[in-house]
């Protein structure tokens, strides 16, 4: 991979998904080398030409799925979840006590462990309310592969 090809890929990924890979040349090369061979692209330039010309977005989706890192597990960053349960939720409960309406967006959800953890914490926190609160949790990720896995709930 030439320096120009690397910069082109890094800039494209950052513009489409906000993923900063400028210091991760070995990751980009490692993940794309086999992908290009398997899919019979003659070069990174050939591949990126096709990605950028693809109006369906399928090739962009494939590129993002290939380059995204899906590191996740239940109660990951326990301190964050403790803060959410012990500080954030009580503040929300007080501020929204009339509406009893809670909407949470969990970005970078990966295979679902973080949003499922949030759902369990929310259910536990509001359990004494007898279902009076309308809670919704939206889980998103740029990797469609991991979202499909998360939606299965396995």
What residues fall within each predicted segment?
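Class I S-adenosyl-L-methionine-dependent methyltransferase module
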Residues: 97-154
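Conserved AdoMet
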Residues: 2-105
């Amino acid at each position: 991979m030439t320096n120009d090809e690397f910069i082109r890929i890094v800039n494209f990924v950052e513009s489409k998904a906000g993923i900063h890979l400028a210091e991760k040349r070995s990751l980009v090369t490692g993940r794309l080398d086999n992908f290009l061979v398997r899919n019979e692209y003659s070069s990174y330039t050939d591949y990126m030409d096709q990605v950028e010309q693809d109006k369906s977005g399928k090739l962009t989706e494939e590129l993002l799925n290939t380059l995204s890192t899906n590191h996740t597990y239940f109660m990951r960053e326990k301190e964050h979840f403790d803060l959410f349960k012990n500080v954030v939720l009580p503040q929300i409960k007080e501020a929204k006590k009339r509406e009893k309406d809670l909407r949470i967006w969990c970005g970078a959800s990966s295979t679902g462990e973080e949003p499922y953890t949030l759902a369990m914490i929310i259910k536990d926190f509001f359990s004494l309310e007898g279902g009076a609160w309308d809670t919704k949790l939206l889980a998103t990720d740029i990797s469609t592969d991991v979202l499909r896995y998360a939606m299965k709930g396995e």
